[in-house]
Amino acid sequence: MATVPTRSGSPRQLTTKQTGDAWEVQARRWLEGKGLRFVAANVNERGGEIDLIMREGRTTVFVEVRYRRSALYGGAAASVTRSKQHKLLQTARLWLARHNGSFDTVDCRFDVVAFTGNEVEWIKDAFNDHS
């Protein structure tokens, strides 16, 4: 678990949620540096959450952010399982419907930004609704 200094000078451990939020901010900044535009963060729909929604040109990009300290057990990208992909697809489907769209009418893709140790990996179009 990550630590941050406090006003008293002694480090305080971050919760899992705080650590995840911090890496999502890093991913957002990194993607913005690559030219993507921010749309939303931590989008919750029935049964799931999408970490980031970005735009690249006319494409809506649903982003899953993952962090692992090391690649000992496969690294961050390997942690996006088929079950997680299914939840992300369902959540995106609901979000699109709420915004008067669907996979048939909106150009979209699913990316993974994986932080493993000090390395960042951007997997564009990591999976889709036909996977």
From Swiss-Prot:
What is the superkingdom listed in this entry's lineage? Bacteria
Fetch the Gene3D superfamilies from UniProt.
3.40.1350.10
Q: Where is this region: Disordered?
A: 1-20
InterPro entries referenced in this protein's UniProt entry, alphabetically: Restrct_endonuc-II-like, tRNA_endonuc-like_dom_sf, UPF0102_YraN-like
User: Pfam families per the record?
Assistant: UPF0102
Ranges of Polar residues compositional bias?
1-19
Q: Name one GO molecular function term.
A: nucleic acid binding
Record's family? Belongs to the UPF0102 family.
NCBIfam families xrefs: PRK12497.1-3, YraN family protein
What is the name attached to this protein's record? UPF0102 protein YraN
Species annotation? Escherichia coli (strain 55989 / EAEC)
Q: Which lineage?
A: Bacteria, Pseudomonadati, Pseudomonadota, Gammaproteobacteria, Enterobacterales
